[in-house]
């Protein structure tokens, strides 16, 4: 599986994200600029310039009309994807660690860090659009709601929306997961103890009914949205920064590696700077993809399940298009089940 190396960022990557159609890849880094790339060949379409500090997070709406960024410069910006212009800016009292659009694209959440006496919160912003063109008509100048860190929880590090935007799920610095009911004024529903260390990433399944987490405690979990029940556990031998669920195939991809401060004294093999593929059902590692010479900070997979991208501490994005062997891979038990199904159909 040959990688396309995308060079454009000067500092470590913080997040990569595909649009819904999978033809564009969005990336942000600690160099204060975001980039948009063609996912087919890795050509850069343009940059989003305007932040003055690290951009921690980026997301694009379901129409590929607008994308949102959250930065350490105490601001959130909304961008027109077609021309790269900033169309709205929101000021924040603290750095913004994560942003994500709701499934309908009319709202987005932003995680505010718990620093400088700020308790930490998940702020919800509304974007009003033309129903026919999906063009922006009005934005809420202030958050329409603030989910303040619930008692007994540390501040949120990651968050996302479930199916139809019914719930918001958040991962926290103390390794816990919490759940909020959007239709009931974002009321706190429940929380569970999951990781031993801070949750570094959380990404949802294609149907938004379950999600995967990663943590520096070297573990990754698959969790059901409705019950917060742990479905699967994936154990590794290195700190994890990112995790994603693959469409089409029953796989998950994990990424991480040794702490960035120790990278200069460590070889790529010892640092474990690989994307690791696990079977989603059987919880077994099935392969690794090397290439980065630093920890993997972020991994994203195209909604069509035909390619994935990884962003590293080394400042590079590696774009991989899956080959036939990836789609053909099956466990013996999977082959036997398919053969049995074909026999039943024949009879």
UniProtKB/Swiss-Prot annotation:
One GO location term (cellular component): eukaryotic translation initiation factor 3 complex, eIF3m
Residues annotated as signal peptide: none
Ranges for the WD repeats: 8-47, 50-89, 149-190, 194-233, 291-330
Gene Ontology molecular function terms on file: RNA binding; translation initiation factor activity
Any one Pfam family match given in the protein's UniProt record, by short name: EIF3I
Gene Ontology terms: biological process: cytoplasmic translational initiation; formation of cytoplasmic translation initiation complex; translation reinitiation; translational initiation
Keyword ATP-binding listed: no
Residues bearing PTM Phosphoserine: 302
Assigned keywords, A-Z: Cytoplasm, Initiation factor, Phosphoprotein, Protein biosynthesis, Repeat, WD repeat
SUPFAM superfamilies to which the protein is assigned, alphabetical: WD40 repeat-like
Location in the cell: Cytoplasm
HAMAP family the UniProt entry points to: eIF3i
Remarks, miscellaneous: Present with 2400 molecules/cell in log phase SD medium.
Role summary: Component of the eukaryotic translation initiation factor 3 (eIF-3) complex, which is involved in protein synthesis of a specialized repertoire of mRNAs and, together with other initiation factors, stimulates binding of mRNA and methionyl-tRNAi to the 40S ribosome. The eIF-3 complex specifically targets and initiates translation of a subset of mRNAs involved in cell proliferation.
Similarity remark: Belongs to the eIF-3 subunit I family.
Quaternary organization: The eukaryotic translation initiation factor 3 (eIF-3) core complex is composed of TIF32, PRT1, NIP1, TIF34 and TIF35. The factors eIF-1, eIF-2, eIF-3, TIF5/eIF-5 and methionyl-tRNAi form a multifactor complex (MFC) that may bind to the 40S ribosome.
Annotated PANTHER family: EUKARYOTIC TRANSLATION INITIATION FACTOR 3 SUBUNIT I (PTHR19877:SF1)
Name of the protein in question: Eukaryotic translation initiation factor 3 subunit I
Organism ancestry: Eukaryota, Fungi, Dikarya, Ascomycota, Saccharomycotina
Gene (UniProt): TIF34
